[in-house]
Each structure stands twice: as structure tokens, then as C-alpha cells.
């Protein structure tokens, strides 16, 4: 039985639109009604996220609903996996891609002929709901953590609005670092933040972690990229958080702030900033540390050398390279 949102009928259309906007409506089942109530099938989502986007009374229930009869068309991945099997097997074309707002970013090697790159871009444009398609021309690089992109199909623009976890974000995929694959990680942090927390987001970018911490008392959002801070300010206004989030354009090493919850989302270089994080965090506070590695041991030893701490939680966020992962560790700092 699908998970359903039980609401009063009078809120039906508005609620349906909000669920669609946030990609939470389960389209495999039909919406049904009984008496004064509607039952809207939804995807698995935390109740707190629903409360943050729906200003109405609701109940989460499991209910038998009629399945939609859908004639399934071949997906983008299915088509390219057949048409370009050789290039995929050689590691030149990846079946994975990112969706940021209404833009798609593919992973296709420079070694693939331009004509084929364009063909794949057009396929993505037709089969993935989007307005524009790009491919990565480089890895993330430089002080601002951005990558070169090549336009393949659709609209040739890089600015978009991305929606996740009940909030919206302006993102320019050519000028700032942003990973939609960390949406689940941001939802995890969102649940941990309390009303009295003072959060310091050391590498804030356009503010996805800062805005996820919206229930905190105060959030310092720091970044060295002026384009990121410009969009962060727009995102603060877009999500009506002017009274909570303080944007700071600076190298974090030059900023003098304190907090009881520190976010270090800079996996490749976070180890270089541990001393600064320990300077920022209050004793008894928590550091959310992101790094790249084969296991958790190296990160734990780094912290244990510098302070009295305990690991509250550790998890693999996603694969980074063969036998390497983006790792998340939550450290409670008992004494510095």
C-alpha cells in the first residue's frame, strides 16, 4: 500500500501543486477521495519536511489506491546503454547524470566525438524533463570549486532554481559549486538542528546547508566565491530567512565567529581546516565533517590528535572513485 497524505478536500489542488513542485507526489497511483478527505499518494519523506512546506493539517496513512496504467517508454539510460555500449564499457560515457533545477549535467569524455556528444544531449533533452543539457568538461577545480561545461541541447543558460527538502535555491552551475546528490545529507542535518543552535557553515556556497539549518537560532554562512555569496543572498531572501542567516564573503580562516554546530562541506580539502573548525566550535558542540577516503580511520585519527572528541555518527554519502567515497562524520568536541 502506498503512503498517502490525508487532507481536507478544500486544500486539494494547492497541496497537489506543492507536492509536484517538490517532487514528492507518487505518480504511480491515482488520487482518491472519501467523504470530505483526499488521499494523495506521496514518496517516502520525513514528516518534518512536509510540515515545513504545507501550512495545513494532514495525516500520513497507508491506503489501497488504484495504480495508474502507464505505458512505459524507454528511459534515457536504457536507450544510450544500448546505442553506445562500447563507449560506456570503455568508461567514456557514464549512465549517471545530475539534475540541478531544470538543467541536466551529463558525464561524457572529451574523447567522444562532438557529433555523438550532441546526439546524446538531444536524447537527454527529449527524455529527461529539463530545459537545458550540458556535459562536464572538467573536474571541480580552483579556489571556487567550479567546473567547465559544454552546452549540448536546449536552452544555453546556467542559472536555475533548484528545489529540495521544501526550500528553493538559485544556482549557477557555471559559477558555483553545488551537488544535488547531497540533498539527502542536507535533510539529515536538518533533522539534527535545534532552536538554540548557532551554526557556522564554513564553505556555504549558495547556501543549501545553511538554509537546511533554518530552524537554528543563527547561521553564519561563509564563502570565498563572490558569485556564490551573491546567489546566497538571493536564496536567503527567497526562503525568507533574512533574520537568521548572515552571509559573509571571506576566506573562512579570516573570519572570527563562534558556534555550537559547524559544517565542513569541502571533502577534498576539509582536513586543512580542522584547526579553524576547532577554533570556531564551542566545547560540547558538533562538527559535521566531510572528507574523501577508503574508510573512516584516517579522519577519526586526525581529530583525535587535535582534541578530545567522540564520533556521534559516520556514514558513506556516495561513491567518489574506485574504492573511494565521500564520507560524513559527526564529531562531538568534548574538549579542545
From Swiss-Prot:
<dbReference type="GO" id="GO:0030488">
    <property type="term" value="P:tRNA methylation"/>
</dbReference>
<dbReference type="Pfam" id="PF02475">
    <property type="entry name" value="TRM5-TYW2_MTfase"/>
</dbReference>
<feature type="binding site">
    <location>
        <position position="186"/>
    </location>
    <ligand>
        <name>S-adenosyl-L-methionine</name>
    </ligand>
</feature>
<comment type="function">
    <text>Specifically methylates the N1 position of guanosine-37 in various tRNAs.</text>
</comment>
<dbReference type="Pfam" id="PF18093">
    <property type="entry name" value="Trm5_N"/>
</dbReference>
<comment type="subunit">
    <text>Monomer.</text>
</comment>
<feature type="binding site">
    <location>
        <position position="265"/>
    </location>
    <ligand>
        <name>S-adenosyl-L-methionine</name>
    </ligand>
</feature>
<keyword id="KW-0949">S-adenosyl-L-methionine</keyword>
<dbReference type="InterPro" id="IPR040601">
    <property type="entry name" value="Trm5a/b_N"/>
</dbReference>
<dbReference type="GO" id="GO:0005737">
    <property type="term" value="C:cytoplasm"/>
</dbReference>
<comment type="similarity">
    <text>Belongs to the class I-like SAM-binding methyltransferase superfamily. TRM5/TYW2 family.</text>
</comment>
<keyword id="KW-0819">tRNA processing</keyword>
<dbReference type="Pfam" id="PF25133">
    <property type="entry name" value="TYW2_N_2"/>
</dbReference>
<dbReference type="InterPro" id="IPR056743">
    <property type="entry name" value="TRM5-TYW2-like_MTfase"/>
</dbReference>
<dbReference type="InterPro" id="IPR029063">
    <property type="entry name" value="SAM-dependent_MTases_sf"/>
</dbReference>
<protein>
    <recommendedName>
        <fullName>tRNA (guanine(37)-N(1))-methyltransferase Trm5b</fullName>
        <ecNumber>2.1.1.228</ecNumber>
    </recommendedName>
</protein>
<dbReference type="InterPro" id="IPR056744">
    <property type="entry name" value="TRM5/TYW2-like_N"/>
</dbReference>
<keyword id="KW-0808">Transferase</keyword>
<dbReference type="GO" id="GO:0002939">
    <property type="term" value="P:tRNA N1-guanine methylation"/>
</dbReference>
<keyword id="KW-0489">Methyltransferase</keyword>
<dbReference type="InterPro" id="IPR030382">
    <property type="entry name" value="MeTrfase_TRM5/TYW2"/>
</dbReference>
<dbReference type="GO" id="GO:0052906">
    <property type="term" value="F:tRNA (guanine(37)-N1)-methyltransferase activity"/>
</dbReference>
<dbReference type="GO" id="GO:0008175">
    <property type="term" value="F:tRNA methyltransferase activity"/>
</dbReference>
<keyword id="KW-0963">Cytoplasm</keyword>
<feature type="binding site">
    <location>
        <begin position="251"/>
        <end position="252"/>
    </location>
    <ligand>
        <name>S-adenosyl-L-methionine</name>
    </ligand>
</feature>
<feature type="binding site">
    <location>
        <begin position="223"/>
        <end position="224"/>
    </location>
    <ligand>
        <name>S-adenosyl-L-methionine</name>
    </ligand>
</feature>
Amino acid at each position: 500500500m502506498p503512503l498517502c497524505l490525508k487532507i481536507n478536500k478544500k486544500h486539494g489542488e494547492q497541496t497537489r501543486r506543492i507536492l509536484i513542485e517538490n517532487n514528492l507526489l507518487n505518480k504511480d497511483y491515482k488520487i482518491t477521495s472519501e467523504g470530505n478527505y483526499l488521499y494523495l499518494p506521496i514518496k517516502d519523506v520525513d514528516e518534518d519536511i512536509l510540515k515545513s512546506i504545507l501550512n495545513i493539517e494532514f495525516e500520513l496513512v497507508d491506503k489501497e489506491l488504484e495504480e495508474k496504467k502507464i505505458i512505459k517508454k524507454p528511459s534515457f539510460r536504457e536507450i544510450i546503454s544500448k546505442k553506445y555500449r562500447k563507449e560506456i564499457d570503455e568508461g567514456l560515457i557514464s549512465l549517471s547524470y545530475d539534475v540541478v533545477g531544470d538543467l541536466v549535467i551529463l558525464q561524457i569524455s572529451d574523447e567522444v566525438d562532438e557529433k555523438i556528444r550532441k546526439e546524446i544531449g538531444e536524447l537527454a533533452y527529449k527524455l529527461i524533463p529539463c530545459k537545458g543539457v550540458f556535459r562536464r568538461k572538467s573536474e571541480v577545480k580552483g579556489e571556487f570549486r567550479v567546473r567547465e561545461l559544454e552546452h549540448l541541447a536546449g536552452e544555453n543558460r546556467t542559472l536555475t532554481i533548484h528545489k529540495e527538502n521544501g526550500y528553493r535555491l538559485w544556482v549557477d552551475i557555471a559559477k558555483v559549486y553545488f551537488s544535488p546528490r547531497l540533498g539527502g545529507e542536507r535533510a539529515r542535518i536538518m533533522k539534527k538542528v535545534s532552536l538554540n543552535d548557532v551554526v557556522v557553515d564554513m564553505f556555504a556556497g549558495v547556501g543549501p546547508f545553511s538554509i537546511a539549518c533554518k530552524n537554528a537560532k543563527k547561521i553564519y554562512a561563509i564563502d570565498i566565491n563572490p558569485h556564490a555569496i551573491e546567489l546566497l543572498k538571493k536564496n536567503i531572501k527567497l526562503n525568507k530567512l533574512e533574520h537568521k542567516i548572515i552571509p559573509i564573503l571571506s576566506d573562512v580562516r579570516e573570519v572570527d565567529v563562534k558556534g555550537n554546530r559547524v559544517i565542513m562541506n569541502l571533502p577534498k580539502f576539509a582536513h586543512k581546516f580542522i584547526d579553524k573548525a576547532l577554533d570556531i566550535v564551542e566545547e560540547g558542540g558538533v562538527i559535521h565533517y566531510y572528507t574523501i577516503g577508503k574508510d573512516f580511520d584516517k579522519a577519526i585519527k586526525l581529530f583525535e590528535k587535535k582534541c578530545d572528541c567522540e564520533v556521534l555518527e559516520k556514514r558513506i554519502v556516495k561513491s567518489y572513485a574506485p574504492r573511494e567515497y565521500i564520507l560524513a562524520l559527526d564529531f562531538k568536541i568534548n574538549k579542545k
